Amino acid sequence: MGTIIDSHFLAFTALVTIAYQFLFFVVTALLKFDKVTDFAGSTNFIIIAALTLVIKGSWYFRQIILTLFVGIWGIRLGLFLLFRILQWGEDRRFDEMRSNLGRLAIFWIFQAVWVWAVSLPVTVVNASDRNPFLQVVDIVGWILWAVGFIVEGTADQQKLHFKRSSENRGKWCNVGLWKYSRHPNYFGEILLWWGIFVASTPVLKGAEWLVIIGPIFLTLLLLFVSGIPLLEDSADKKFGNVDGYRIYKKRTRLIYLLNVIYLFGLWLSRNVSSPSAMSRLLLFCH
């Protein structure tokens, strides 16, 4: 089993992620400086993708494209979050963690798991010796990534511009994409990582299909744990007594995801619903 894990760079990327996140944990714990937290997460994705591509050395077109996708996403998001927190001056998520080393450690452990798990599709593709011809599913995955990337970037900039305006102080963002969804940035992030998974499927074989854990983990994380629930609670505390906000919340979708899940379910049923394909998906090793 160790050979199988190492041949897919799973142990290697786990060690790299643990070391990288531990470094920033030490900085945060000793200096009480938490402004690099999101930057540490975003750049860790880039490091994993780049290292696995270079170490394997195959340089297949599909590997290069997916690595570039991760790099472009990580650079944009990492710099955006870093500049934003430097402007705002504090990260309220850590208000109760700065003096509690145990809770702070749990956060960084969870971030390491997040990075490693979500990176699984790219990690396995970059570790693979298989290089099938480009297929329609590759293009579909690239389109999903592009749409998700544009949506996330646009939503981030729209909200940042909204909050910078003194006229909008004390208001919730309801312009641009935020007029149609309460969390369009998270929709974009979920979509682009599902796109990366879809584009990785031509390479996957047997137990490698378990990399679907990556986008599933991200989706559940943002929907039910650390993403949307925290922001919804914060907004409810700030604007819960405002009639306009209650109307906005009632009329505006949380996230445009159900239609995407339905379409992906159709695709998945056509590609892995046969007995042989499902058996490959459920195999733990091959």
For each feature predicted by the language model, list its residue ranges.
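Hydrophobic transmembrane alpha-helices
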Residues: I5-Q21, N44-I75, V118-Q158, K163-W267, ...
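C-terminal ends of transmembrane helices
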Residues: F22-F33, L79-I85
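Transmembrane helix irregularities
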Residues: L30-L31, I75, I109, S181
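Juxtamembrane helix-capping/reentrant segments at transmembrane boundaries
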Residues: L31-F45, G89-F107, K171-W178, L254
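Select subsegments of transmembrane alpha-helices in polytopic membrane proteins
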Residues: F39, R103-V115, R182-E189
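A basic- and aromatic-enriched beta-loop-alpha substructure that forms the phosphate/nucleotide-
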Residues: R62-N100
